[in-house]
């Protein structure tokens, strides 16, 4: 049988692998319509593949090709975000607002994704290809108060669900940064257990102790820095910072 996503010679993607640009649900509710977004993502992948194999004028180029792997559970750039005692905003990042509970730094641009206009020509409101628009910022330390819930006493968060706005998430959400925040949360959790307190009590009462743990880190300091690509095209370190 044939899929019906409307592919033709002009609208089909002549590719042999996926890229970050394949992104569905940009005009949908990322939480309430998550199942639809996943299903539509699978639909366009298999629809495009079916067209290339069966109906494309140059289908012989794909005759001996087969799909090796398609993720059933796709990666999410954005979904639920929880509210902490501080909500990080675009203004915080752009104006480099300094907070006394600074933790791990983000080193990426404010990277926001939108439907690709070329894809919109054929799939208006049902786009599955994206473009990104990046705003350069200085590397910015995430406040500790973004890493725990303001209304659930014993809950930390450290990934793409931390207390930030949609725009601020554009720089925070990359894996190396969320990994660093995970380390911070682990350190803070150890202090909560040690001192028998909730996450909110760490700042300011035990924050100096947390700072010492963060300065010590958990990595091997003698290893070379091979993660420069994670720094994006930032404005470089901010000078005259307290």
Task: Locate each region found by the language model.
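Flavin (FAD/FMN)-binding glycine-rich loop and adjacent Rossmann-like elements that form
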Residues: 1-242
């Amino acid at each position: 049988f044939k899929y019906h996503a409307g592919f033709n010679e002009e609208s089909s993607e002549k590719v042999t692998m996926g890229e970050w640009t394949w992104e569905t649900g940009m005009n949908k509710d990322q939480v309430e319509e998550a199942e639809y977004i996943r299903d539509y993502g699978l639909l366009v992948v298999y629809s495009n593949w079916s067209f290339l194999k069966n109906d494309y004028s140059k289908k012989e180029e794909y005759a001996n090709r087969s799909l090796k792997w398609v993720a059933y559970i796709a990666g999410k750039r954005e979904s639920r975000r929880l509210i902490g005692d501080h909500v990080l905003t675009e203004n915080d990042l752009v104006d480099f607002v300094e907070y006394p509970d600074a933790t791990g730094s983000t080193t990426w641009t404010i990277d926001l994704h939108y439907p690709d206009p070329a894809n919109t020509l054929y799939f208006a409101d049902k786009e599955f290809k994206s473009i990104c628009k990046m705003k350069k910022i200085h590397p910015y330390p995430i406040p500790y108060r973004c890493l725990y819930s303001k209304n659930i006493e014993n809950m930390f968060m450290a990934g793409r669900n931390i207390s930030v706005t949609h725009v601020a998430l554009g720089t925070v959400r990359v894996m190396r940064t969320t990994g660093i925040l995970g380390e911070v949360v682990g350190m803070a959790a150890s202090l909560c257990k040690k001192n028998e307190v909730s996450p909110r009590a760490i700042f300011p009462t035990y924050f100096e102790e947390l700072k010492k743990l963060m300065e010590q880190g958990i990595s091997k300091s003698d290893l070379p820095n091979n993660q420069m690509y994670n720094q994006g095209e930032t404005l470089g370190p901010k000078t005259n910072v307290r």
